Amino acid sequence: MAPLVGLFLIWAGASVFQQLHPVNGGDIPDPGSKPTPPGMADELPTETYDLPPEIYTTTFLPRTIYPQEEMPYDDKPFPSLLSKANDLNAVFEGPACAFPFTYKGKKYYMCTRKNSVLLWCSLDTEYQGNWKFCTERDEPECVFPFIYRKKSYESCTRVHSFFWRRWCSLTSNYDRDKAWKYC
């Protein structure tokens, strides 16, 4: 047992020493000179930056809607962090998500993070540039009855569920669409 403890201490000590970085003091200042804190320059930078005249606002507000003509990227539903303020993206409540919707050839049955940091959904069944950030109210509804492995279910089920959590299908036929959510 003692040899194992010794090997462990050697391994742990070596790991600690490998993580240490050498400290280089640099040039030694002349005796009697005033010390300068690291990173301090004698002069401040003189660069200036021209900002655009428009008023900008961040878009991290939930429930934000953007029409296609305001889209900052080609067919990407995520606005830039600085988007022009307008009447549409200041709206807090908007139309409902169109579930299921198709975006770039893939069908979505719930909000997605595709090309985005935040959850969003399309307002059209075929994505045409009209979209919004999702809220708690934008969750898709369970569809009852639904078919799972050729059996009909009238309510949420725990069959084949991870940790026995109840789930439901988002379409009438799970076997065909594979769309589901936890209840």
Curated annotation (Swiss-Prot):
Pfam families the UniProt entry points to: fn2
SMART domains: FN2
Protein purpose: Binds to spermatozoa upon ejaculation and may play a role in sperm capacitation. Displays heparin-, gelatin- and phospholipid-binding activities.
Sequence segments annotated as region (Disordered): 23-47
Signal peptide: 1-25
Keyword Cell inner membrane: no
Domain of life per record: Eukaryota
Cellular component terms per the entry's GO annotation: cell surface; extracellular space
Residues with attached carbohydrate: 36, 46, 57-59, 64
Claim: Secreted is one of the keywords in the record: yes
Main location: secreted
Swiss-Prot/TrEMBL keywords: Disulfide bond, Fertilization, Glycoprotein, Heparin-binding, Repeat, Secreted, Signal
Disulfide feature: 97-121, 111-134, 142-168, 156-183
Location in or out of the cell: Secreted
Organism taxonomic ancestry: Eukaryota, Metazoa, Chordata, Craniata, Vertebrata
GO biological process assignments: phospholipid efflux; positive regulation of sperm capacitation; single fertilization; sperm capacitation
Similarity comment text for this entry: Belongs to the seminal plasma protein family.
An MF annotation (GO) of this entry: heparin binding
Identification of the protein by name: Seminal plasma protein BSP-30 kDa
Residue intervals of the Fibronectin type-II domain: 92-136, 137-183
